[in-house]
């Protein structure tokens, strides 16, 4: 394992509730009579990308209106307002990283293991989420960052992963990806990257066929995984465990 590549939303932090609240706040601000509840948003998450999700929903509820000439302009405006609301919610550090994430980032830095990000979210959302827990210079901790500002085609297409691999100068099999959703898993696997999946409540019902390992989270000494996982000396993932899993076979833990 020569590099570790993280997805962001749902993987680094359980962000989807904050995104959902931000979407609904944006709808109210612009006067749209839309409201997304958690079950609906769970289904909409099958569509990667916030703007793409908005267009998909618009076509669901009013196909004729969704063909209008100002639809793109409206979606851009709603998404910009949503991004502002999201940044306000997470920017003060109110959204913690998931168990194991901060520790693994530190361990990788100490070991000289390159880290990367492969996400469909925007650079603004990345900054809002990561500045508080990792510091204003958080980007320096990652050898490559692929996001919505660098790669237009969203997951499950592998484009963002392929772009990150090119920047790292590595093959897919040299790396390990950490994802939380079926779309993310499909994208990473299409790029040839072995993948560990840590679902959230919004993705727990996804199919993770082809994942190297499925875990509730990566664990920490103070918040261990519910059970021991083969290849891990403790009930949390450290670099030694990740390397063991990278070279291992299909295991599933719940």
From Swiss-Prot:
Cross-referenced InterPro entries: CbbY-like, HAD-like_sf, HAD-SF_hydro_IA, HAD_sf, PGP-like_dom2
MF terms in GO: hydrolase activity
Domain of life of the organism encoding this protein: Bacteria
Any Pfam family hit: Hydrolase
Protein family: Belongs to the HAD-like hydrolase superfamily. CbbY/CbbZ/Gph/YieH family.
Name by which UniProt lists this protein: Protein CbbY, chromosomal
Species of provenance: Cupriavidus necator (strain ATCC 17699 / DSM 428 / KCTC 22496 / NCIMB 10442 / H16 / Stanier 337) (Ralstonia eutropha)
